[in-house]
Amino acid sequence: MMNLTNKVAYITGGSKGIGLGVAKTLLDNGMRVAITSRHLSAAKEAAASLSSDESKVLALQSDVSSMQSEVDAIKAVTEHFGQLDVLVANAGVGHFASIESLTEQDWKDTIDTNLTGVFNSVKASIDALKQSKGYIITIASLAGTNFFENGSAYNASKFGLVGFSQAIMLDLRKYGVKVTTIMPGSVATYFNGHVPNDADAWKIQPEDVGQMITDLLQMHPRTLPSKIEVRPTIPGK
């Protein structure tokens, strides 16, 4: 069982949605967090909403599609906090169109962020996580096992992410590093231009994902839930 007090989590895409909800929950449970966004102003605004104490919250600019950007961000985390215990690979985008309408740039942006971006985050953080015997949480989607119309790019990225995550789980467990893939259904976030509102009350809330991660971190070291599907209890109409 991980004692969460003063442990450090690095959360990509942490300025809103699931990432921000996870950061808030981990912070409430005594952890320190580093959150990233492609835009530093967004990361700083989110960090300020969490805490004014820079010893607890660090805001960083990083583009997960760039390996060097992630290497620089992880270096900043370890220099600031002195350690890294948890990676939450959450940054993601969605482009939805029929194959006739899907552009090459939409395809590239989706794969570079949702799949290559996680590869970059893992590669950049793995040495620090081996040292701490830490935990990697990848945020996939039910779209990682269920395909749908106009979802070719998104499905490909999330199917790939599930496979990647399960493979590295086998690679890394011998070092004491755990890997879990969380596959949420409908979550009340700003994803794909949506603005959360009262009609989203039936959906999973970002803090629910944060609570799930907290529970995972506190499980006995001998126990490894490698893949978790989570849905709203009662789907909305």
Language-model features and meaning:
Residues 8, 15-17:
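Conserved glycine-rich cofactor-binding loop
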Residues 29-45:
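Conserved glycine-rich Rossmann-like NAD(P)H-binding loop of the short-chain dehydrogenase/reductase
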Residues 40, 61-73, 104:
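The beta1-alpha1 cofactor-binding region of Rossmann-like NAD(H)/NADP(H)-dependent oxidoreductases
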Residues 98-99, 106-108:
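Substrate-binding pocket helix/loop in short-chain dehydrogenase/reductase
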Residues 122, 157:
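Active-site helix of classical SDR
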Residues 141:
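Residue(s) in the substrate-gating loop at a strand-loop-helix junction
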Residues 177, 181-182, 189, 198-237:
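C-terminal helical subdomain
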